């Protein structure tokens, strides 16, 4: 099988794989065009009876002009007995293809991914092989980050955390030592500042002085009108008068307290119970009814 055209790009770079178009490789509305650019390729051929050796030789032949460093092919079996192949390919330089059929083996099409963690991907391919095939030597990719530089940055950050005494000082020190990170990750640094220097717990202070809420503008009015209201039944039990007389006396008290009738010189009720309650309006009446005492 002749190889399909590919283009090669030099230099380091992370690979990118996207959705493979359906319908014979034609891009349909809503789908993205296939593109692969990487040094490390991870392939999975589901339900593929081809042997690892045959598959490996075909892939190696297809990549013979691409400076291929290493190929590893393993075969595993599903629980239903169907075989599938895993293939890991390492190239010397980045290569790019826009053909979703580039790694097809006869009629078997693989799932194609750029292996962003080459060593872990190779280890995954080697986990439970029934058989395998190998070509070349795997070269562990170089880590771009300098260990010395990373250790120095960690040391600087530890010093900032140890020496800062407030949120503002912490953020100021971070901004001075790591200006770029401060600009693009300010929200994360603010979060860590809040964690390092939390607000002191606030002591609860009741908004109203009285424990019974009688000084509350709404609850206090409700207490006076509802909770401290004496029923005719309660008054008749205490004063030894009929319930009807108690109702008359309570109505008189209501008129007295709500309209200021006493100041206008209206004649008072002669009921003994009424005369007592006249001096016990509000919370005192509730205490009187509860304790049964007029003293």
From Swiss-Prot:
Q: What does this protein do?
A: Implicated in enhancement of V-sense gene expression. Acts a an inhibitor of C-sense gene transcription.
One short Pfam family name for this protein? Gemini_AL1
GO-annotated biological processes: DNA replication; symbiont-mediated perturbation of host cell cycle G1/S transition checkpoint
Extract the ranges annotated as region (Disordered).
Answer: 1-31
Provenance organism: Chloris striate mosaic virus (CSMV)
Instruction: Give GO terms: molecular function aspect only.
Output: DNA binding; endodeoxyribonuclease activity, producing 5'-phosphomonoesters; metal ion binding; nucleotide binding; nucleotidyltransferase activity; structural molecule activity
Motif RCR-2: list the residue ranges. Answer: 84-86
Family, according to the entry, reads as follows: Belongs to the geminiviridae Rep protein family.
This protein is called Replication-associated protein A
Write the record's keywords in alphabetical order, separated by commas.
Activator, Covalent protein-DNA linkage, DNA replication, DNA-binding, Endonuclease, G1/S host cell cycle checkpoint dysregulation by virus, Host cytoplasm, Host nucleus, Host-virus interaction, Hydrolase, Metal-binding, Modulation of host cell cycle by virus, Nuclease, Nucleotide-binding, Nucleotidyltransferase, Repressor, Transferase
State the GO CC annotations.
Answer: host cell cytoplasm; host cell nucleus
Q: Where is this region: Oligomerization?
A: 192-204
Q: Where is the signal peptide?
A: none
Tell me how this protein assembles: Homooligomer. Part of the C- and V-complexes which are RepA-Rep-DNA complexes involved in the c-sense and v-sense transcription.
Q: What is known of its domains?
A: There are 3 rolling circle replication (RCR) motifs. RCR-2 may be involved in metal coordination. RCR-3 is required for phosphodiester bond cleavage for initiation of RCR.
Q: Where is this motif: RCR-1?
A: 42-45
Q: Main subcellular localization, coarse class?
A: host cell
What residues does the CRESS-DNA virus Rep endonuclease domain cover? 35-138
């Amino acid at each position: 099988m002749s190889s399909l055209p590919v283009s090669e790009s030099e230099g380091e770079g992370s690979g990118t794989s996207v959705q493979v178009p359906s319908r014979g490789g034609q891009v349909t509305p809503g789908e993205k065009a296939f593109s692969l650019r990487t040094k490390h390729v991870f392939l999975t051929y589901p339900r593929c009876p081809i042997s690892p050796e045959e598959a490996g030789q075909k892939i190696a032949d297809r990549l013979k002009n691409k400076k291929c460093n290493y190929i590893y092919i393993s075969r595993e079996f599903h629980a239903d007995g169907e075989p599938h192949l895993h293939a890991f390919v390492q190239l010397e330089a980045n290569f790019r293809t826009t053909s979703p059929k580039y790694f097809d083996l006869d009629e078997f099409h693989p799932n194609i991914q750029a292996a962003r963690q080459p060593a872990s991907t190779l280890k995954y391919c080697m986990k439970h092989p029934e058989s395998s095939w190998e070509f070349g030597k795997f070269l562990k990719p170089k880590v771009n980050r300098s260990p010395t530089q990373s250790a120095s940055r960690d040391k600087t950050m530890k010093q900032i955390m140890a020496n800062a005494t407030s949120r503002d000082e912490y953020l100021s020190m971070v901004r001075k030592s790591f200006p770029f990170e401060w600009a693009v990750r300010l929200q994360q640094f603010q979060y860590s500042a809040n964690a390092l220097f939390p607000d002191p717990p606030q002591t609860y202070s009741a908004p109203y002085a009285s424990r019974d809420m009688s000084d509350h503008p709404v609850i206090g009015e409700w207490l006076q009108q509802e909770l401290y209201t004496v029923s005719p039944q309660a008054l008749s039990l205490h004063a030894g008068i009929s319930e009807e007389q108690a109702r008359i006396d309570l109505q008189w008290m209501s008129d007295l307290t709500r309209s200021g009738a006493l100041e206008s010189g209206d004649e008072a009720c002669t009921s003994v119970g009424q005369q007592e309650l006249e001096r016990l309006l509000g919370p005192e009446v509730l205490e009187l009814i509860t304790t049964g005492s007029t003293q």
